[in-house]
Amino acid sequence: MSKLLYLDNAATTKTAPEVVEAMLPYFTEKFGNPSSVYSFAAANKEVINQQRDAIAEMIGAKSNEIYFTGGGSDSDNWALKCTAEAYANKGNHIITTKIEHHAILHTAEYLEKRGFEVTYLDVDEDGKVKLDDLKAAIRPTTILISVMFANNEIGTIQPIKEIGEIAHEHGILFHTDAVQAFGQLPINVDECHIDMLSASGHKFNGPKGIGIMYIRTGVKIRSFIHGGAQERKRRAGTENVPGIVGIGTAAKRAAANMEERTAKEREVRDYLIDRVLNEIPYCRLNGHRTDRLPNNANFSFQFVEGESLLIKLDMKGICGSSGSACTSGSLDPSHVLLAIGLPHEIAHGSLRLTLNEEIEKEDIDYVVDNLKEIVAHLREMSPLYEDFIKKQKKHGEK
């Protein structure tokens, strides 16, 4: 293996050197507990608030609407469970989609077991929510709509502003899982009518184990973790100061270079998509062709098993994914690909490649050249492909 090409940035990203540098003093020098009264430690409370300011500015929020959590799944659980509890006297119905991250889907299932009713919306063949279906699903008892900003597997961007407008027209709270979108797309919580938003530091070159929860002023939401008075009595536990500094620094970095960075990612992504679709037969792009995350490409290859494809790519130093990193150990096909209408056998042959700003077109050439050989080799060993080719030849002879 001569080189390593990391193309799984939807799973996690490399922590930026400047982020690590900003964090280091808070492990060994400025290690005080922000809740302590002496100045050595209390200074860290101001540092935490500075990170809140930076993140709030990035999404058009107020500083006191930003809460720090343990990650995206933590924030998603908080949004659903504690909103459901707080508004149970108003209603017991929640609307989400069939293509959400499992942090949402499994939490929704948890709530169903506790008496809440959940509608799981279908999506179209590109993975987009159909707004008419959303409107039709609303009931007098609907208290929350939760739709991800952009899908972690196929990259499709949802009509978030329109969904938020529909929610607010009906007096319903709107939560969005923006774990993949934060740092990749401009977000304004007021323009999009967002009441709650989840994000995770390690998806935009920050550290793992630290997340963000935006909660609009006036939204009633119960405490998720009970104990001390941290995070304005809504999330107990001594603050992860190094992590908070890290996620704040990463957010500032992402905001500063977003336009230039994502323009490059989009150009390289389109180069990848064009080469794969033009040079590898019996292949399809999953997700919307243009309304997709700048760094996301997701393909399905007929007559190829995704796990074998990943192993062969790994042998060439290419890191990719067959779906969400949180479910990659499962032998079941992606619930997202099934939801957009793919048959099981095609969904099983999926490959997600997600870029970063360091990936160049020359790297894509290496990837595609190897991918062509690997797909051809795997198909040679497939009896299904052999039968398909025989039928094609027989049909051509008629």
Predicted regions located by residue number:
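Pyridoxal 5′-phosphate
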Residues: 1-398
